[in-house]
Amino acid sequence: MFITPKLQSPSRNFPQIFTNLVPFCLFGWLASINSLEAQTIALWGKPTCAVEPSDRTLKDNLRKTNNSAYPALIAKHKDQITECRSQDPIKTQALWLRLYAKDTKPEVLADVLDRIVNRGYNTVFVDVFYDGQILLPVSDNPTPWRSLTAEAVKAGKVAADFDLWAEVIRQGRDRGLKVYGRSFAMDFGYSYSQIPDRASVLAVNGRGETSISKSQLNPNANAVTNGKASNLEPNEADRVFIDPYNSQARSDFAGAIASLLKRQPDGILFDYLRYPLTKGLANNVKDLWIYGEAARNALLASMPDAGTKQLMAIYLAQGEIPPKAIAMLQETQQKITGMTQVRSKNPAFAAKLSEKFLWQLAVNHAYQGVLDFANVAIASINLTVNSNKNLGSKPAIGAVFSLNGNAPFWNRFPLSMERHPMTYALCDDGKCVANEVIKVINASPKAVVCPVLAGTWGQSWRGHPSLETQMQAIRAVAPQINCISHFSFEWVEPESDQERKAGL
């Protein structure tokens, strides 16, 4: 992982600089100071609406000493960011953030949020449900998933009722930050699969495999290693995908979202609205994840007539339509209706035509499962907000997706969902990233599009150009884009992230 070098301030380096420069002229000393300042600026980059260096240092010192002037400086920066963003073309500049148990310490979370504001961000996307754990307090977690703070609570280091999700929303708003939750959708996490009565909830393909038994190296693993596809992971062994048609899965997920919404975030983003990754294109019905009991029953129930239903059942079971199945179906239909059936003169040809028709029905059914699950999430939000007037206005709703991993149904998401495409293409000038953004805009011209960029400020990272370069490229071809997010705090502030990961 790329680690930004830790720089000491020029004032702390002054004694050494002064000693080394005694033999040299004043011009040389000034040149050295200018060089050091340039290095600091290059590593910080040029984020728009950033807090001035002197104010950053002052705020850090005030926080560490618990000075009474700290809240006033926070309020000042809040007003400055609000004013600056209102005049900047990018009205919403967001940063992705994952919290850890150490963030339950008030001073740690305050430092994280101060760092985010310092770089000119006015929105933060917080991971609230991922890898089988949820950002709810142990004492108020009605979901099947483990609380993020469970281990810390068990160790006696965090109170069972500590609500980190509510706290980051409160502290974020104190600083003028809008706070969104980012939730995995169809990936429920490995721990969910270990619940005895949830085995039937998992997505299953035509070979009886779940995403656990099918776990494999990601076909794009090399791309992950060299930075070409930062949204993908080397393997999906811990990714447990559910059958989107399963009522238990829908109920569990709706309940989790309702609990998270009680903390009144500004928005909620849904990621992993897809099935498990597979090698290459699916070209056989048994490759599709529609063999769970709920998905299969829903597919058969949607068939237009009994004959098509019978053929689909054969197709699902055998992965093909044998010619003799056509003849058998005609005989069955004749017995049922009492009408003489016109026999096909070429059963093999009729079987192939039937396969093409049934294949399209099966593929559409798979797509529809994802779209229906997205609508379940939206319905859960609407129901929660409408049934509880204390929650205020309805939060923004968005879908996070990869243009490849979610192909080809991301453009079918409801228009009410913001588009947050992970535009992670690699090129020196950022134009390839801009091209991906244009692709999403053209496919969803009426939807809000807020691209997700990978990288860091002021420098390239594993082939990703600087965030400044990518944003300039996007603005050049899509000036209507006024919302952008950066993945992630871990890459922008690597030292802080590593220190917080270390635990309490």
Q: What residue spans do the PLM features occupy?
A:
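Polysaccharide-binding and catalytic clefts of secreted carbohydrate-active enzymes
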Residues: 214-385, 396, 403-413
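Short, acidic/polar
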Residues: 102-117, 248-259, 402-414, 433-437, ...
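Aromatic- and glycine-enriched glycan-recognition loops and surfaces
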Residues: 103-119, 148-175, 369-372
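Mature N-terminal, pre-catalytic/accessory segment of carbohydrate-active enzymes
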Residues: 2, 34-111, 115-121, 126
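Active-site-adjacent "subsite" loops/lids of carbohydrate-active enzymes
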Residues: 87-104, 180-262
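Aromatic-lined carbohydrate-binding/catalytic grooves of carbohydrate-active enzymes
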Residues: 119-160
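Substrate-binding cleft of secreted/luminal carbohydrate-active enzymes
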Residues: 402, 420-504
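The substrate-binding groove and active-site-proximal loops of carbohydrate-active enzymes
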Residues: 93-103, 143-162, 236-251, 358-369, ...
